[in-house]
Amino acid sequence: MTKRAESKFKINRRLGVNLWGRAKSPLNKRDYAPGQHGQRRKGKPSDFGIQLMAKQKLKGYYGNISEKQFRKYYEEAVRRKGDTSENLIELLERRLDAVIYRMKFALTPFAARQFVNHGHVLVNGKRVNIPSYLVKVGDVVEVREKSKQLAMVLDATQSGERDVPEYLHVDHRLMKGTYARYPKLSDVPYPVQMEPNLVIEYYSR
C-alpha cells in the first residue's frame, strides 16, 4: 500500500467511521485510531468534541479539504439566503472533484481531485483543472476523449460500490453527465451520517 493510500485510511481510523463505505477500509480490521494510544478507552465527548468530529468527517469526506478553504465554504453558506447547513452541503457537492466522484468517473474523492488536476475533465467543452471549481445547474461535465480509456476511469464506471445520485444525469458510455439540480442534504448518498448543523455550530462559537 502506498503512503498516500495509508494516509487516506488513517482518516477513517482517526474518525472511527468508514467515511466512503469502501470494502478496503481499515475499520474492517480494527476500529480504533492510528498510533500507539489508539486503543485507549475514550470518555464521553464534550459538545465541542462532537462539533469538531462533525467538521472533521465532512472535511475528510471531500478529500480532506484544507481548513482555510473549508471555512470559506462556511462563510459563503452563511452569506447566502436559506438554511446554512443546506447551503454548505450544496457548495461542497458543486465542487468539480466531488461531481467527478459522484458521476463515478473516479473511485475516491482523492482520485477525483488528482484526475481534475491532471486536466482530464471538460466542463461545457472547456478543460478545467481546478478541483474546487463550482459546477452550476445545466453544466455538462465529461471526461476528455484521450482520457476515456484510462484504467482508473474504466474501473470507476464499472464499479458496483456506488450509484449515481438523482441530481446528476450521467451517460457512462459517453462518459458525460449533466448537473441537473442542486441537492439537499437528504439527496446526498453519504455512507455515514453527516451533521452539517453541528459544523455550523462549531464555527458559530
From Swiss-Prot:
Please report the stretch or stretches of sequence annotated as the S4 RNA-binding domain: 118-178
Q: Cite the entry's keywords alphabetically.
A: Ribonucleoprotein, Ribosomal protein, RNA-binding, rRNA-binding
Q: How the protein assembles, per its UniProt entry?
A: Part of the 30S ribosomal subunit. Contacts protein S5. The interaction surface between S4 and S5 is involved in control of translational fidelity.
Q: Which GO terms describe its biological process?
A: ribosomal small subunit biogenesis; translation
Please report which protein family the annotation says this sequence is part of. Answer: Belongs to the universal ribosomal protein uS4 family.
Q: What name does UniProt use for this protein? A: Small ribosomal subunit protein uS4
The UniProt function text for this chain reads: One of the primary rRNA binding proteins, it binds directly to 16S rRNA where it nucleates assembly of the body of the 30S subunit.
Q: Where is this region: Disordered?
A: 27-46
**Domain of life of the organism encoding this protein:** Bacteria
What SUPFAM superfamilies does the record point to? Answer: Alpha-L RNA-binding motif
Please tell me whether the keyword Ribosomal protein is annotated for this protein.
yes
| Gene Ontology CC: one annotated term | small ribosomal subunit
Gene3D superfamilies, alphabetized: Ribosomal Protein S4 Delta 41, Chain A, domain 1, RNA-binding S4 domain
UniProt gene name = rpsD
Q: Does the keyword rRNA-binding apply?
A: yes
Instruction: Cite the InterPro entries for this sequence.
Output: Ribosomal_uS4, Ribosomal_uS4_bac-type, Ribosomal_uS4_CS, Ribosomal_uS4_N, S4_RNA-bd, S4_RNA-bd_sf
Q: Which GO terms describe its molecular function?
A: rRNA binding; structural constituent of ribosome
What HAMAP family is this protein classified in?
Answer: Ribosomal_uS4_B (MF_01306_B)
